[in-house]
UniProtKB/Swiss-Prot annotation:
It comes from the Bacteria. Keywords: Cell membrane, Lipoprotein, Membrane, Palmitate, Signal. This is Uncharacterized lipoprotein YdeJ. Residues 1-22 form the signal peptide. Its main location: membrane. It is a lipid-anchor. A lipid is attached at C23 (N-palmitoyl cysteine). Residues 32-42 have a biased composition (Polar residues). Residues 26-89 are annotated as: Disordered. It is found in: Cell membrane. It comes from Bacillus subtilis (strain 168).
């Protein structure tokens, strides 16, 4: 009888130990599962953070890229406009001096139907009438424009560099000094200096100016 009780106690104790062991394993499993879930969440956060960071950097870079593209487009537009302006300007290949000579003749030249435009420079101090020793002298450098024929007339002027010129009413050909009384030439040439006119030069028609430049002869 005692032996049976002893066996019964042993079986009961063994059963309790098995039950306790099962409960312990269950608790360990439950504890491990949240830990695994937490690790998974942390892993997802690690993967998410670089993506968000990359997206932010990309968003920040976009305005800079657009700005650079705008600047490049503006530069290209400006360059195209400058090239078109040069193509449209038929006088771009000519010097400002030649353009000035042509503009002055186009505005003041007595005859526009000329086959040649002669340009001659006269220094200050040179006599207005080179054929008369009593002639007054030019007070400033002047330029004389004339056609190839006497009937074409002439224009004698000084460029002021501000869009205006001083015009001297000087004939292309003077009468012989023998035909003029002594002292008269002095009065005539001094009167030319005194009565010089200031004239504003118009820009004129580019095609007509180009034609005059093409037949220009500078001496």
């Amino acid at each position: 009888m005692k032996k049976r009780r002893k066996i019964c106690y042993c079986n009961t104790a063994l059963l309790l130990m098995i039950l306790l062991a099962g409960c312990t394993d269950s608790k360990d499993g439950e504890a491990q599962q949240p830990s695994n879930q937490a690790s998974a969440v942390q892993t997802d956060e690690k993967h998410t953070e670089p993506e968000e960071s990359t997206k932010i950097r990309k968003d920040e870079a976009e305005p800079i890229t657009e700005s650079e593209e705008s600047a490049t487009k503006a530069a290209n537009d400006t360059s195209s406009a400058e090239e078109k302006s040069k193509e449209d300007n038929v006088l771009a290949a000519y010097s400002s001096e030649k353009i000035e000579y042509a503009r002055v003749w186009l505005q003041l030249g007595p005859n526009q139907e000329i086959d040649e435009l002669n340009v001659r420079h006269i220094a200050a101090g040179e006599p207005i009438n080179p054929n008369d020793d009593t002639s007054a002298s030019y007070p400033e450098n002047v330029t004389q424009l004339a056609g190839s024929r006497l009937v074409d007339g002439s224009v004698t002027y000084h460029g002021n560099g501000d869009g205006t010129i001083h015009v001297y009413n000087v004939p292309l050909r003077w009468d012989s000094a023998d035909d003029i009384e002594k002292g008269v030439m002095r009065e005539v040439t001094e009167s030319i200096i005194k009565n010089r006119k200031t004239v504003y030069v118009d820009t004129g028609d580019d095609e007509k100016i180009k034609r005059l430049i093409d037949i220009m002869m500078i001496h």
